[in-house]
Amino acid sequence: MHIGCRTPGQLLSLFFKENGKVMNPLQEYLSSTPVEKVNTSMVAYVANLTKVAEVAPDIASDVVKEFDTQRKHLKLIASENYCSINTQAAMGNLLTDKYAEGYPAHRYYGGCENVDSVESTAAEEAKALFGVDHAYVQPHAGADANVVAYWAILNKKIEMPSLEEIGETNLSHLTDEQWANLRAKLGNQRLLGLDYYSGGHLTHGYRQNVSARMFDAYSYTVDKETGLLDYDAIEKQAMEVKPLILLAGYSAYPRAINFKRFRQIADKCGAVLMVDMAHFAGLVAGKVFVGEENPCEWADIVTTTTHKTLRGPRGAIVLCKEEFAESVNKGCPLVLGGPLPHVMAAKAVAFKEARTPAYQDWAHKVQENARELAKDCINLGMKLQT
């Protein structure tokens, strides 16, 4: 995060005197900085924290200390990153005051025109960034996005055809017996995803997670010798399991995936291909993963967080083919109680940033640095997982 030339220590000193009394850091910064050297990012950051410090100086102090920590330490946690001050500014505003259940032009509350514009802009930016038919930008976290995607698939492939069979469209009109039968169908579908201990995520069918309670969940693993995905073995298992959803993507697998091959497997076993790209979405947006390594070209539904490699606010999105758009848009109220308008605004800003040449350069450097780190580790005698 670039907020000017001040060091974290100098920034902290703007807020508190030695006796702990809260100062006016914005006034201090502006009075001590020549006009031509005033940094607008610094002004925005300090102005925000000045207001926080007026009410909760301890919280302002903790925020500045976290800034100090992030500036002084190299983070090697794969799921963490740094979002821009532009993104942070978009998130800290009065949009948080607005309820907006539903989706653009289909809200439960009135006066949502501005939120509609924000959400529509974020969705259009996401569609352009990833080259997809539809984007749903409401989910608050990757786990939420996965559950929205799961239920969208269940709605499209199980619920809607079942209702059509009995000539009904409204769930409220079902008899108790019809409702029980539908619930049984929805709760007995199969999911095939990457095993948790092979690098899959909790939400990919791990038994301690709700995903394994929603589905009859099965897992494929990496090859025990190479540590790599064995696509032929996955295909064989998929043909045996016949899952409704074939889930690709990972939380801790350090290689690119051949999504074209997964598409072939899904088509052969009759499954919907879903991809969770939360940990590498930035490499897709940055044009590092292209062709068969770009899940957006092959999957029916793709989910991702917006932080991690996307460098946006903490949140998530669901991307899909037009076939699933209507079902995905039912995420609220099916799964979500409502969107966070201020976070959707920040997502829009982050997506705009990710469409720049500078972002693509950064994304390619991520891969280059990872490869150099791997080489150096090998030269030092370390055994890499793959």
Residues covered by each model-derived region:
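Aromatic (phenylalanine/tyrosine) cluster motif
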Residues: F15-F16
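A signal for specific C-terminal beta-sheet/loop modules enriched in small/flexible residues
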Residues: M1, M23, M91, V210-F215
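N-terminal glycine-rich, Lys/His-bearing helix-loop that initiates the first secondary-structure elements
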Residues: N19-T121, Q264
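Conserved PLP-binding catalytic core of the aspartate aminotransferase-like
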Residues: L11, K383-T386
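Conserved PLP-enzyme active-site core in the AAT-like
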Residues: T121-K383
